[in-house]
């Protein structure tokens, strides 16, 4: 009896120990699953930390390269983006998770594209700057060259020696103008047009030509706004006419044909007349028919006689 009781106690103890061991230590398959999950989480964390660190490094590098040289920034950013994508793919393959590698590739490619686009848009290449500067310099330098050429072509304008005097009364004559304007210098010519119907009356204006332009300037200064016969007059300078170029413009009018003579105008009238007999031809046929009848009637009458 004692042995059976001892055996029962020992069996009960073994069962309790098995229960404790089952509660304390999980199965080896569960341990493996948990270890795999932990390793995946660690690899994901490592991949994200590496991506963030690589992005920060890439941004710092691009900023430094932009300040150093704008032309080499685009090429270097491309190389950094390719290296970052290669490192991200290596981390993804080591971890064995396809989702993390795809996300790292897309992130690195987007960052590299944004950095390259910002660098290209923000700072233009030095070649473009030089080209723009050349264009601006050329556009600025062209107008003064044209002005210089025009100045060389243009001769200095001669000073006027002729003065136009307006708003004269009809009582003023050439002698009066000669007396007044001879005080300012030697007068070369006085032109005072007269009305056709009343030759003793002037049209109200005159031209006075001096020998020197300085004398004409004196007359303009003193007599513009002065009074003659109780009325204010106007004195203005008359510019000398420019020498005209040789008459090349007269060639087109010479090419114009003169009006045709009378004998050339007659043929179209003859043509018009030629159309009219065709219209009158049936009328003539009708007119001939009664004559024939008359002849026949006469012949018949003669035969009867």
Swiss-Prot record:
<feature type="compositionally biased region" description="Low complexity">
    <location>
        <begin position="68"/>
        <end position="126"/>
    </location>
</feature>
<keyword id="KW-1017">Isopeptide bond</keyword>
<dbReference type="GO" id="GO:0016607">
    <property type="term" value="C:nuclear speck"/>
</dbReference>
<keyword id="KW-0507">mRNA processing</keyword>
<feature type="region of interest" description="Interaction with SAP18 and ACIN1">
    <location>
        <begin position="159"/>
        <end position="244"/>
    </location>
</feature>
<dbReference type="GO" id="GO:0000381">
    <property type="term" value="P:regulation of alternative mRNA splicing, via spliceosome"/>
</dbReference>
<feature type="domain" description="RRM">
    <location>
        <begin position="161"/>
        <end position="240"/>
    </location>
</feature>
<feature type="modified residue" description="Phosphothreonine">
    <location>
        <position position="161"/>
    </location>
</feature>
<feature type="modified residue" description="Phosphoserine">
    <location>
        <position position="157"/>
    </location>
</feature>
<comment type="subunit">
    <text>Found in mRNA splicing-dependent exon junction complexes (EJC). Found in a post-splicing complex with NXF1, RBM8A, UPF1, UPF2, UPF3A, UPF3B and RNPS1. Component of the heterotrimeric ASAP (apoptosis- and splicing-associated protein) and PSAP complexes consisting of RNPS1, SAP18 and either ACIN1 or PNN, respectively; the ASAP and PSAP complexes probably are formed mutually exclusive. Component of the active spliceosome. Associates with polysomes. Interacts with the cleaved p110 isoform of CDC2L1, CSNK2A1, PNN, SART3, SRP54, SRRM1 and TRA2B/SFRS10.</text>
</comment>
<keyword id="KW-0597">Phosphoprotein</keyword>
<comment type="similarity">
    <text>Belongs to the splicing factor SR family.</text>
</comment>
<feature type="region of interest" description="Necessary for interactions with UPF2 and UPF3B and UPF2-dependent NMD">
    <location>
        <begin position="69"/>
        <end position="121"/>
    </location>
</feature>
<feature type="region of interest" description="Disordered">
    <location>
        <begin position="1"/>
        <end position="170"/>
    </location>
</feature>
<dbReference type="GO" id="GO:0003730">
    <property type="term" value="F:mRNA 3'-UTR binding"/>
</dbReference>
<feature type="region of interest" description="Disordered">
    <location>
        <begin position="240"/>
        <end position="305"/>
    </location>
</feature>
<dbReference type="Pfam" id="PF00076">
    <property type="entry name" value="RRM_1"/>
</dbReference>
<feature type="compositionally biased region" description="Basic residues">
    <location>
        <begin position="127"/>
        <end position="143"/>
    </location>
</feature>
<comment type="function">
    <text>Part of pre- and post-splicing multiprotein mRNP complexes. Auxiliary component of the splicing-dependent multiprotein exon junction complex (EJC) deposited at splice junction on mRNAs. The EJC is a dynamic structure consisting of core proteins and several peripheral nuclear and cytoplasmic associated factors that join the complex only transiently either during EJC assembly or during subsequent mRNA metabolism.</text>
</comment>
<feature type="cross-link" description="Glycyl lysine isopeptide (Lys-Gly) (interchain with G-Cter in SUMO2)">
    <location>
        <position position="7"/>
    </location>
</feature>
<protein>
    <recommendedName>
        <fullName>RNA-binding protein with serine-rich domain 1</fullName>
    </recommendedName>
</protein>
<feature type="region of interest" description="Necessary for interaction with the cleaved p110 isoform of CDC2L1">
    <location>
        <begin position="1"/>
        <end position="220"/>
    </location>
</feature>
<dbReference type="GO" id="GO:0005654">
    <property type="term" value="C:nucleoplasm"/>
</dbReference>
<dbReference type="InterPro" id="IPR034201">
    <property type="entry name" value="RNPS1_RRM"/>
</dbReference>
<feature type="compositionally biased region" description="Basic and acidic residues">
    <location>
        <begin position="33"/>
        <end position="59"/>
    </location>
</feature>
<feature type="compositionally biased region" description="Basic residues">
    <location>
        <begin position="151"/>
        <end position="167"/>
    </location>
</feature>
<keyword id="KW-0694">RNA-binding</keyword>
<feature type="region of interest" description="Necessary for interaction with SRP54, nuclear localization and exon-skipping">
    <location>
        <begin position="1"/>
        <end position="161"/>
    </location>
</feature>
<dbReference type="InterPro" id="IPR035979">
    <property type="entry name" value="RBD_domain_sf"/>
</dbReference>
<keyword id="KW-0508">mRNA splicing</keyword>
<keyword id="KW-0832">Ubl conjugation</keyword>
<feature type="compositionally biased region" description="Basic residues">
    <location>
        <begin position="1"/>
        <end position="10"/>
    </location>
</feature>
<feature type="modified residue" description="Phosphoserine">
    <location>
        <position position="53"/>
    </location>
</feature>
<feature type="cross-link" description="Glycyl lysine isopeptide (Lys-Gly) (interchain with G-Cter in SUMO2)">
    <location>
        <position position="15"/>
    </location>
</feature>
<feature type="modified residue" description="N6-acetyllysine">
    <location>
        <position position="218"/>
    </location>
</feature>
<dbReference type="GO" id="GO:0000398">
    <property type="term" value="P:mRNA splicing, via spliceosome"/>
</dbReference>
<keyword id="KW-0007">Acetylation</keyword>
<keyword id="KW-0866">Nonsense-mediated mRNA decay</keyword>
<dbReference type="GO" id="GO:0043065">
    <property type="term" value="P:positive regulation of apoptotic process"/>
</dbReference>
<feature type="compositionally biased region" description="Basic residues">
    <location>
        <begin position="266"/>
        <end position="298"/>
    </location>
</feature>
<dbReference type="GO" id="GO:0005737">
    <property type="term" value="C:cytoplasm"/>
</dbReference>
<dbReference type="GO" id="GO:0048025">
    <property type="term" value="P:negative regulation of mRNA splicing, via spliceosome"/>
</dbReference>
């Amino acid at each position: 009896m004692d042995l059976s009781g001892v055996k029962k106690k020992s069996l009960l103890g073994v069962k309790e120990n098995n229960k404790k061991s089952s509660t304390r230590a999980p199965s080896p398959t569960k341990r493996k699953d948990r270890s795999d999950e932990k390793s995946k989480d660690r690899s994901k964390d490592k991949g994200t930390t590496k991506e963030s660190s690589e992005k920060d490094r890439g941004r710092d590098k691009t900023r430094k390269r932009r300040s150093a040289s704008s032309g080499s920034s685009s090429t270097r950013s491309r190389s950094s983006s390719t290296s970052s994508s290669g490192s991200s793919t290596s981390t993804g393959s080591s971890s064995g998770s396809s989702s993390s590698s795809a996300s790292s590739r897309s992130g690195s490619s987007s960052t590299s594209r944004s950095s390259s686009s910002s660098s290209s848009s923000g700072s233009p290449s030095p070649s473009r700057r030089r080209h723009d500067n050349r264009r601006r310099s050329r556009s600025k330098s062209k107008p003064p060259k044209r002005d210089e050429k025009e100045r060389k072509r243009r001769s200095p304008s001669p000073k006027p020696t002729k003065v136009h005097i307006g708003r004269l009364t009809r009582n003023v004559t050439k002698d009066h103008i000669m007396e007044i304007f001879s005080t300012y210098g030697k007068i070369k010519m006085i032109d005072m047009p007269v009305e056709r119907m009343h030759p003793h009356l002037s049209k109200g204006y005159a031209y006075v030509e001096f020998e020197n332009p300085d004398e004409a300037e004196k007359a303009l200064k003193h007599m513009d706004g002065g009074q003659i016969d109780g009325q204010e007059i106007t004195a203005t300078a008359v510019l000398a006419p420019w020498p005209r170029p040789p008459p090349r413009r007269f060639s087109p009018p010479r090419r114009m044909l003169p009006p045709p003579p009378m004998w050339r105008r007659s043929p179209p009238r003859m043509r018009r007349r030629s159309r009219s007999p065709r219209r009158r031809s049936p009328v003539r046929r009708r007119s001939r028919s009664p004559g024939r009848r008359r002849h026949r009637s006469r012949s018949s009458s003669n035969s009867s006689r």
